[in-house]
Amino acid sequence: MNRRTLYNEFLFQFPLEKIRNMKLDEYTNLNRENSFCYWLESKTVELGSIWGGSSYKFGIYRYDKRPDNPSVVVSDEEYAWYKKYNASNRDEAFEIVLKAIVTIAESALSGNLEAIEEENTFGNVVKWKIAFLYANEMLLPIYKRDMLEKAASKLGYSDSAKAKIYELQHFLMSQKGGSSAARREAL
């Protein structure tokens, strides 16, 4: 499957309307092939990798083996979620995660990249992958800050280490020409 087809398939599987009403077991489950998290990390890897790290990066996840890291996560009999959410149960934790996903997706669609930058429910890699998938080809599929900094510096951006991620994305897209044809090539 080429990247264009994969991109469209993701949007077919997870349109914004579906995301707004997504249930926890659609977000994360042990039948990995149909969950949002599986698509985000594995199925769409050709649209930029977010591999590595633990499942914590998704905010809440269904586990096979109960995590043993009480300083970072809270868990019940099926799910684990970040302690920093101060959620008393899985439903509260998922509400926080889902709100963040919707905010990121809506902000990406409207071009409000500053709002994505400010969102802190997820780490940068996860939130910018979500943003890329909903941004109508206005972002590059590069999610790691250091990679964006290197690319921007190489193309003449001064002091890329102090720039916001959305500023680096804007700059890099402008260097590609910013046309819809150039954006399609980014896929």
Residues covered by each model-derived region:
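Short hydrophobic alpha-helical segments that form membrane-spanning helices or hydrophobic packing faces
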Residues: 127-133
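An N-terminal alpha-helical hairpin/helix-loop-helix interaction module that forms a charged
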Residues: 1-124, 135-187
